[in-house]
Design a protein with these regions (language model features):
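Short, T/G/N/S-enriched strand-turn elements that build extracellular solenoid repeat scaffolds
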Residues: 1-186, 190-207, 211-216
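Ser/Thr/Gly/Pro-rich low-complexity, disordered linker/stalk segments of secreted
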Residues: 159-165, 179-279
Length: 280
């Protein structure tokens, strides 16, 4: 139906949905399927992931915007695919984002745990709530992370280079692999507690000048350039990690939404559902 503007996939059954390549630029897609896997190659006006099986949403398309309101989700942007933006807005959630392709922007709007694995490209991560963000990956390009004033208490951990701009009080844990990271305070109340477990000095730029946090030490640096609470680290920690996903299956029903039945176990589904372009 070419007049469909809102499509909802809703089921509690164990299913796998394949959405083939196609331009559905007038359709808002909502997925409310806590036991489903989704492989998406279609381009939509918007995508809202309300619930999905913790393991996998596989993105193969280019240019989609995804909002994650699920408590637990894993989004994989495959090589050659891209997302314009991912917004994470469910407080208390645990979200994994894996970027083998490109993500232009990630917006974290709630106190959630976000694990970000970057083998491709991420344009910017904006944090506007006291979230925990763990970054890893094979990328050698520094990932820009902007921590806004409303994110007091945010915690950022990275084993890959990052460029952090902090407008409030945050913790920044840098482990081996994060050499070359840059830190800047951008607000009157900014203070960055830098734990430096890299092999190099980490420089913190403030309006009053640049301060240094030596390797194997932790220091707090505020917006006035004051350095306090310097201690020696006892050990270095690497955080983050990725997990694999499974596919599952079910049946479709009409009315712009999908539901499925399952005769399989936790690993092997009954069948896979393909939503064809002609349906939507």
């Amino acid at each position: 139906d070419k007049n469909v503007k809102n499509l909802t996939i809703k089921t509690d059954n164990e299913v796998a949905f394949n959405i083939p390549s196609g331009n559905y630029g007038k359709v808002n897609l909502t997925v409310d399927a806590p036991n489903a896997d989704v492989v998406n190659a279609g381009t939509f006006k918007s995508i809202n992931i309300k619930a999905i099986k913790p393991n996998t949403w596989k993105e193969k398309a280019k240019g989609n915007t995804i909002t994650v309101t699920a408590d637990d989700a894993r989004i994989v942007v495959e090589a050659g695919a891209s997302l314009s933006k991912v917004t994470v807005s469910q407080e208390g959630g645990k979200i994994k984002i894996e970027a083998a392709g490109t993500i232009d922007a990630i917006q974290i709007e709630a106190a959630v745990d976000v694990s970000l694995a970057v083998d491709g490209t991420v344009g910017e991560v904006a944090v506007s709530a006291p979230a925990k963000v763990a970054v890893e990956g094979k990328t050698t390009a520094a990932i820009p992370i902007k921590v806004e004033e409303t994110a007091k208490g945010a915690d950022v951990t990275s084993s890959t280079p990052v460029e952090v701009k902090a407008a409030t009080e945050i913790s920044l844990n840098l482990s081996k692999g994060a050499e070359g990271s840059k830190v800047e305070t951008t607000g009157e109340n900014a203070q960055v507690a830098v734990k430096n477990d890299t092999t190099e000095v980490i420089k913190v730029t403030t309006p009053a000048g640049t301060q240094e946090v030596a390797k194997d030490t932790t220091s707090k640096v505020d917006n006035a350039g004051k350095v306090t609470d310097t201690t020696t680290n006892t050990n270095g920690d690497n955080n983050g990690g990725t997990t694999g996903g499974n596919t599952s299956g079910g049946n479709t029903s009409g009315g712009g939404s999908s539901s499925g039945g399952s005769t399989g176990g936790d690993v092997t589904p009954a069948e896979t559902v393909t939503i064809y372009p002609s349906v939507i």
